[in-house]
């Protein structure tokens, strides 16, 4: 039985669901599709000539390089190593190029310098100042930025010329002006040159300048061409927004990298009264976290690092600021142009940052914070106030141009203290010197000078020792220029004095006279370095204790504030001698045999 074929009638079609019926496109969608197709065809037709030109240029360039390579490989002398006189003549630029230049502006080197070219003999490194080649005429050309052959490498003229950049179709020559220079004794300077087109249309987006011998000047001798570093050429309209390298102190803050003129970051800085690079650096020194928070999340950490690095290349002026902590101007801190801490003034004398010890740095840190909180009290030194004072002018110059001061040229200590006693405000200004070594009266000098005289020949008993010390005070004199042995950087007075006392005491205890003296008290002393020797902290012996060191230090500080001179130094010696005698007697008494009652 044959099955009937499915016959679809109009009635059945009408009964189909709405989703299965063939939809008729709307008129609007048909128009949109037609417009899209037409637009795509127009776009393809407009891009086709551009693609054809780019491809043809690249193919020509590749073929020319391939042809030059083949021609060079067939040549018996592929490279111009030496001329007929055995010299290797090369042109070199002696001026670095800036990272950016602008169309319509004068072509200049870094920081606006003139661009110089020299002809040298690579075998000797000397400038060729004689001969026909020293007066050659050179052509200035524009090269591609990706001409990355090193200057110490050799290349052929064809290879050099393959990187030359020609003007675009319908454009003027890329470089206009004095495109030829003539060497004079092997040296030449580029004249007035101007770029007429930017470098954004070539692959590397950068240009190089190159020089090569003009036609007719390189036939009888071989000279290798020269090229500069790559640089970008921008449209002259961008010069109004040009960044400065390095920035000047009074440049507007948007001259710094990553800060666009009238941008969001620039407006934030202006709102905080940060108008110039100087304002930026000062806040960076005083409170870098505040500056970072001010810029906010709109500046990434990488952008922040670039901006700060660029700002720190700024060349500072010679201004100084001093903040005094008292009315006598005996103590204060010194800052540079951007409020960086540069040194400490103590007792009317200037100590540079590099010469401060640990304790002085802690004190200086407190004073610096105090100065920043009360900056309106700081005094500005711009050189005008001190011009009438030749001594002060010389010392301020030494502050701006740091240099080491030897111990032999240090001033007499007593003279310095006499000057401090009669200082006025101007006198304190004269006291600002840039010396890496503090110059008050050093107590270790007294210890070094007089321990050498007294301790090796220590008397046989304590009373004779005291009398000899008192008599030596009258006969000895203090010489401020008789310096103690040089000390290490950052070593304090207490460390030097304690070390000196320890060494001299060890020598003293090893003498026969001291051994006999101690035996009279029943004390047995071992040599240094053995168990229970001098300087150990064991209870069975005595040593140089910290409290005694503190007494010496306090005495030094009190006496230092009272004055100076031979009388004061004599009293210091006498006190030290008496304290040492009392110390010896006390320790000897502790070691005396005691009678113990035994049941």
Curated annotation (Swiss-Prot):
A Pfam family annotated for this chain is Calmod_bind_C
Q: Where is this region: DNA-binding?
A: 150-273
Molecular functions (GO terms): calmodulin binding; DNA binding
rRNA processing listed as a keyword:
no
User: Which keywords are on file for this protein?
Assistant: Activator, Calmodulin-binding, DNA-binding, Nucleus, Transcription, Transcription regulation
The ranges of region (Disordered) come to: 1-21
Q: Where is this region: Calmodulin-binding?
A: 1-80
GO CC annotations? nucleus
- Entry keyword annotation includes DNA-binding: yes
Q: What is its main location?
A: nucleus
**InterPro entries given in the database record:** Calmod_bind_C (IPR046829), Calmod_bind_M (IPR046830), Calmodulin_bind_N (IPR046831), CBP60 (IPR012416)
Q: Where in the cell is it found?
A: Nucleus
Disulfide bridge partners, by residue number: none
- Which function does this protein serve? Transcription activator that binds DNA in a sequence-specific manner, likely 5'-GAAATTTTGG-3', to promote the expression of target genes.
The entry describes its oligomerization and partners as: Interacts with calmodulin (CaM).
Annotated family: Belongs to the plant ACBP60 protein family.
Q: What is this protein called?
A: Calmodulin-binding protein 60 E
The record lists the organism as: Arabidopsis thaliana (Mouse-ear cress)
State the gene name recorded for this protein: CBP60E
